[in-house]
Amino acid sequence: AGILWAGFVLKPAPRLLYNPSVSAAIGWYIVEPLKVAKRGDLVASRLPGHAESLASTRGYLPAGVPVIKTVWAVAGDRVCVDAGVLTVAGQPPLPLLGQDRSGRPLPVWTQGCTSLRLGEILLISNETPESFDSRYFGPVSLSHVIGRAVFLGDISWHTPDEREASDW
């Protein structure tokens, strides 16, 4: 029984997350294990400490809440930031905003070009250019990635009376 329990603890069941942010489609996601992160994967991830602190302080996201973002670049990719634009070979250029919606300056994590190291990825929102993502806090360690995020939809809950009325 101890061995079975240990195996269960080491391989947790997929998680269910609700995303209320416009940085990814609003709704429910199941989070599945992810062995290798590839460009284009939608993932649930914790933010690096400095980014989590800033996001929490500014009210973007409570501390400890995961984000859902797209893997934009992986280890070995050359990432450049120049004149307020982030570029990665094979990806469309992304503008960097100078300030957030409240007029506060956004951080710039690098100037010039750098190559992502083994175990690093860039996480970007495909949904909104105003997302707080790797454009502002830089690479994320794969150890922060919880898993692949699979969109289930925005499930609405209705009382039996509402459901019957909406069926007509």
Predicted stretch roles:
Residues G2, A6-W168:
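Soluble "head" domains of membrane/secretory-pathway proteins
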